[in-house]
A protein has these predicted regions:
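Canonical positions in the second alpha-helix
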Residues: 1, 34-35, 69
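Structural marker of alpha-solenoid helical repeat scaffolds
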Residues: 4, 38, 72-76
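TPR alpha-solenoid repeat register
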Residues: 11, 45, 78-79, 85
Length: 94
C-alpha cells in the first residue's frame, strides 16, 4: 500500500511502529518525523515520537516533542490527546 500511497500518514505511522517492534527505533523516529512534517495535527505521532526519544535517552527532544503536541492539542481542542501528552511530559519532568 505504501507503494501506491507513500505519503499516507497512517501507513507511515503504522510502519514506524513495526520498525520499533523490530528494535529499529531510529528508523521509527525518522518515519514519524516525516509524518509530522506532512501532517502537523497528527496528535498520536507526538506521543509516540516522544516515547521513542525517551527510549534512546534523548530527553530534550522528548520534552520538545510533547510540548509541541500539547500546543497542537490545545489549538484543536483535543482534550484526550492533551491529557495523554501532559501526563507523558509530567512523568518525564517528575
Amino acid at each position: 500500500m505504501l507503494k501506491t500511497e507513500p505519503n499516507d500518514s497512517f501507513l507511515n505511522y503504522a510502519l514506524a511502529l513495526e520498525f520499533a517492534k523490530a528494535n529499529d527505533v531510529h528508523k521509527a523516529i525518522e518515519l514519524i518525523e516525516n509524518v509530522l512534517l506532512r501532517e502537523v495535527n497528527y496528535l498520536g505521532a507526538y506521543y509516540q515520537l516522544g516515547k521513542f526519544y525517551e527510549q534512546i535517552q534523548d530527553l530534550p527532544k522528548a520534552i520538545d516533542t510533547y510540548t509541541k503536541g500539547i500546543a497542537i492539542a490545545k489549538s484543536i481542542k483535543n482534550n484526550k490527546a492533551l491529557g495523554e501528552l501532559n501526563e507523558a511530559l509530567w512523568m518525564l519532568e517528575d
